[in-house]
Amino acid sequence: MPIAGTKYAPFPAPQLDDRTWPSKRIEKAPIWCSVDLRDGNQALIDPMGHDRKERMFRLLIDMGFPEIEIGFPSASQTDFDFCRWAIEQGDVPDDVDLQVLVQCRPELITRTFEALEGAKTPIIHFYNSTSELQRRVVFAKDVGGIKQIATDAAKMIMDMAAKAGGGYRFQYSPESFTGTELDVALEICNAVIEIVKPTPDNKLIVNLPSTVEMNTPNVYADQIEWMCRNLDNRESLIISLHPHNDRGTGIAATELGLMAGADRVEGTLFGNGERTGNVDVVTLALNMYTQGIDPGLDCTDINRMKEVYEYSNQLKIAERHPYVGELVYTAFSGSHQDAINKGMKARRSANSPVWEVPYLPIDPQDVGRSYEAIIRINSQSGKGGIAYILQADYGLNLPRNLQVEFREIIQHITDEEGKELPSKRIYEEFQKLYVTQPDARIKFVDHHTYPDPEQKGRRILTAEITDNGVTKTIEGKGTGPIDGFVDALSKYLGVKMSVVDYSEHSLQQGSDASAISYVEMVYPGGKLFGVGINDNIVSASLEAVVSAANRVIAK
């Protein structure tokens, strides 16, 4: 790359030593305006036809956007026709205002009013570019010439609105605001304000777009705060933000801009738009939601939002996209999985409605996702993740030492195969190793116990087993069935074994529930686990002992 300082110069930042926005907090949601059907649509390789537009439009209404920019009706017949459809057949709720975009050109303004005939309180959004670069390179005009473009358009729009009988709302944008000197932007905006003559009951929207993101988010916040302080008739204005994401900080710039005094945000679902996109209003809304602020948008079915986005825009959402990507509620890391597992357990036992689970800033169910894919297993996964999957999907509450033991088995498989293991495969490996044991030597069949006549408090157990398919009867003594069965197997196999840990639980609810038992067995070479599942709790325990014994003699 060329030396940075010889090819690129830093864009100047305003001097605002008494800025107040850093100490502010976002306390309420802004007025939201979707520009998916205009700014988003113009950025598509294959712009939307009517069906794709209508599907997006219905979603935006269902989500609760109070303002929706439906197109640039003077730019194409497609946009004009959709505007007419929305007004005549779109069943637009009374609390939703439709917005259209128009350049400051007389013939386009006339066509725009034709498109809006019969609309309820439509917003006419007129704009012209004001930046130093575009004044010099594109328009070859001085500040006075650029200001006249804006004021001539404002006069024409106000005259036509008056003749049409009123009911219109107005929005002006000094396009490429972030590349415009602040005093120039102020001069042009104030000139438009003077013509529109807004009131507190009929406010003018002054939109201050970061058409191209040119600086750090704090600079945009300084620009917004400066304009909020200096614009004429501020109480009669709605200050709007329209950030883009060229530097990857559109979300941060918007949030700081709201702290700096803005009232409104224009953006798109999941950030579709020219170049790197417009600001993502879904991420903004859910950022607020997770801070306890009502976002004013309904994001409870984020899967539908994703589906409509991908259908209407013919674009795919990245797997790591905040809140909506396939993997954003998923942990592969062992330490993360362990923390999530413990957090979910703590939440189940807590009596607080507050969401507090490590590594999950939002409850996936709040946006229509499930807990099924929170933890997924690969070579980076730990015991907590595997335990969570077996508990969540199959109702198995593995003892901690068994979690450690089984994790090593799964680790070996993932290292060998080099890919993620789905939940079903993990359960199948658990069943094969501990429960079904298809190649096992010993199988449990039945048992009986009776008091030991020679020693009070102890019992004699006789058990029927098969050894490589041959039926055998074995006998042992102990304080109970498990103790006696371990004694019998130890003598029969010639290996001293003893149980050091035992636990069990039901696999379902009700009187016909199966039981699962876990035993940790010590033998001369170490210790390991066995697992048994049976309708009878005692039989499940003895099957767990056989499971462990089979693993001992297989070593």
From Swiss-Prot:
Mg(2+) binds at residues 39, 242, 244, 278. Residues 30-303 form the Pyruvate carboxyltransferase domain. Pathway: Amino-acid biosynthesis; L-leucine biosynthesis; L-leucine from 3-methyl-2-oxobutanoate: step 1/4. Its cofactor is Mg(2+). One of its GO terms (biological process) is L-leucine biosynthetic process. Residues 437-555 are annotated as: Regulatory domain. Homodimer. Catalyzes the condensation of the acetyl group of acetyl-CoA with 3-methyl-2-oxobutanoate (2-ketoisovalerate) to form 3-carboxy-3-hydroxy-4-methylpentanoate (2-isopropylmalate). This is 2-isopropylmalate synthase. It comes from Brucella suis biovar 1 (strain 1330). The gene is leuA.
